[in-house]
Regions:
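AMP-forming adenylation/ATP pyrophosphatase catalytic core
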Residues: 14-37, 60, 161-164, 229-335
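Hydrophobic (often cysteine-bearing) scaffold residues that line and stabilize catalytic clefts
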Residues: 44, 75, 201, 205, ...
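A short, flexible beta-alpha/helix-coil linker loop
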Residues: 97-100, 190-191, 273
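ATP-dependent adenylation/nucleotidyltransferase module used to activate substrates
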Residues: 2-148, 178, 185-186
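A generic secondary-structure micro-motif detector
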Residues: 69, 111, 169-170, 199, ...
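Catalytic subdomain that performs nucleotidyl-dependent activation
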Residues: 127-131, 136-227
Length: 335
């Protein structure tokens, strides 16, 4: 059926959905919205289209078709119709990688598709906007607490970040899913239903855990917000110290594929942090490897390092990763 979309009105320019886009995009003359057809990215594209037209900026929609469901062709047609309606070009990347459902190959699939996704983003040479909202942040909090990782950023996302040399902007990160749905319904914006399976961990958090917490005491989630805001200052301070320490780590390029990193075990920052898994995960991400060792592997390394030193030894952290441990240094070898 024909979409009876409400026209953008003067009062819409003062709404938070619009003003957040305006604040975050002011310095850019070109930007793209990664659109899936879900309510978040559909509403985001609506406001971004209005912003681009009003300010004479270049705007486009980009979509990755994973071809992993029978309905994918219909979804692409839906997005094409939407792009014509808001007068924005739609660029599509077709994925032809078959996903193996076994956990054994899941990491390889996710790593490969992530690289393709960010290479696609990078090809446009502009910031990419994503429709993540506050509910996504809450899901990340519980996922990170469950995995005992990313204590330095439990939300797992920020309004602006740089990932794989791509500027990522999330204008709706402080907006609730409910407010986004209500606004989309008011504006008659069509959208596809959430495809996250109800049986998945994310689905259970979205459909059961978070609603249960809200029913028990809605102030609990607000408390998470305030806690993260309060600790952000300390996170930023720690990150500055981490970056200074990281610059002091000696890198030795042995060949095109082999590198080593020497860590001073008596360095004050190292001594204060080496027993924290988040420290090792943060350090690992700076090495820009395609995959990382498991949490279990990092815990085993920490237990090894906590043991009083008696003699030189070698610790295997993962495939092609070994660590030579001496009294005063760690030498990490990557192959």
């Amino acid at each position: 059926p024909e979409i009876q979309l409400k026209q953008f009105e003067k009062r819409n320019f003062t709404e938070t959905f619009y003003t957040r886009c305006e604040e975050l995009l002011e310095q850019y003359n070109k930007f793209a919205v990664s659109i899936s057809g879900g309510v978040d990215s559909m509403l985001l594209s609506y406001y971004c289209s209005a912003y681009a037209k009003r300010n004479k900026k270049e705007f486009m929609l980009i979509h990755i078709n994973y071809n992993n469901r029978k309905c994918c062709p219909e979804e692409v047609k839906f997005l094409n119709d939407w792009s014509h309606l808001i007068d924005a070009p739609l660029k599509i990347k077709e994925m032809q990688i078959i996903r193996d459902r076994s956990s054994k190959y899941r990491e390889d699939y996710e790593r490969t598709t992530k690289k393709i996704r960010f290479d696609f983003y990078k090809s446009f040479g502009c910031p990419v906007l994503l429709g993540h909202n506050k509910d996504d942040c809450y899901e990340n909090i519980f996922a990170n607490l469950s995995k005992q990782i990313h204590f330095d950023n439990l939300f797992g996302m920020r309004p602006i970040s740089v990932n794989n040399d791509v500027t990522i902007i999330r204008p709706f990160i402080n907006s609730s899913k409910r407010s986004i749905i209500e606004k989309a319904l008011y504006l008659n914006i069509p959208y596809l239903e959430d495809s996250t399976p109800a049986w998945s961990v994310r689905g259970k958090m979205r459909d059961s855990l978070i609603p249960m917490i809200q029913d028990f005491d809605c102030n609990i989630l607000k408390g998470f917000d305030e806690y993260i805001k309060t600790t952000r200052f300390f996170e930023n301070y720690w990150e500055k110290k981490f970056n200074i320490w990281r610059d002091s780590v000696n890198e030795n390029i042995i060949s095109e594929t082999v590198k080593s990193y020497t860590i001073d075990k008596i360095d004050e920052f190292y001594v204060e942090n080496f027993q924290e898994m988040s420290f090792w995960i943060k350090f690992w991400f700076t090495l820009q490897q395609q995959s990382r060792p498991s949490n279990k592997s990092f815990r085993q390394l920490i237990e090894k390092l906590k043991t009083p030193f008696t003699r030189n030894s070698t610790h295997i952290l993962g495939k092609q990763v070994k660590i030579n441990i001496t009294e005063n240094h760690l030498v990490i070898h990557l192959e």
